[in-house]
Amino acid sequence: MVRIPLQKSTENKAEKMAQITEKVDVCVIGAGHAGCEAALACARMGLETVIFTVSVESIALMPCNPNIGGSSKGHLVRELDALGGEMGKNIDHTFIQSKMLNASKGPAVHSLRAQADKAEYSRRMRQILENQEHLVIKQAEVCDLLWDDVNADAVSGKSGATKKIRGVRTFTGTVYEAKAVILCTGTYLKARCLCGESITYTGPNGLQAANHLTDSLKEMGVAMR
C-alpha cells in the first residue's frame, strides 16, 4: 500500500489554482457608487465586465452618508441620470425622506436631497448588477495589477517608456486578463479607523480592508499618500 503525502497533493492543488486565467474586457475594482455605475456603463455597451468587491454585502453600501443629492454632489447625480446611470433611479425607489435645500433662496441654488434606506438601496443595487447582461460580480480581493512595459509611441504617440495594463490578480491567485481596469476603491486601500488614540486596521463599517493593492499601485509608479 502506497500512501500519498497530503502536503504534496495540497501544493499541486494550489499550483493549479494559481494558473486559473479568465479573459474579460473590463475589470472594475470596487462596488461602491462609482464602481456600480462604471460596471453598468461598460456592460450596457456590450463589454464583458467583472466587478470585484471584498464582500457582496458591501455593494453600494453607504457607511458614511446615506444621502443622495444635496448641494455638494447633487449635480453629479443629475449628470449620471442624464447619461443613463442608476443612482438617481435607485434612490427614487428606496428613499425614506426628501427635501429641497435652499428653498428660501433663488432657484440657482435649489438642491434636492434624498435620504436612503441604506439596506434597501444596497439590496436593490446588488439585484440590478446581478441581472445585468455581460456583468459578473466576484467576491474577491484584487492584490496585483498586471501590466507590460511598452514603448509610449504605440500607446500615446509620445516618446519614452510607459505601462499598459493587461489584467489583475486576486488573493487566491486567479488572473483576469482585461483590456482595461477601472479603480473605484474608495477608502478601502490599507484603511484605518481612528478613535482617539486607538487605531484599528479595518475597512468602512468594520469590513475587510484592501491591504495589498496599494503596494501594487506604488510598484506601478502611482503616488500614494
Outline where the language-model segments fall.
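Core beta-strand elements of the Rossmann-like FAD/NAD(P) dinucleotide-binding domain
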Residues: 22-24, 169-180
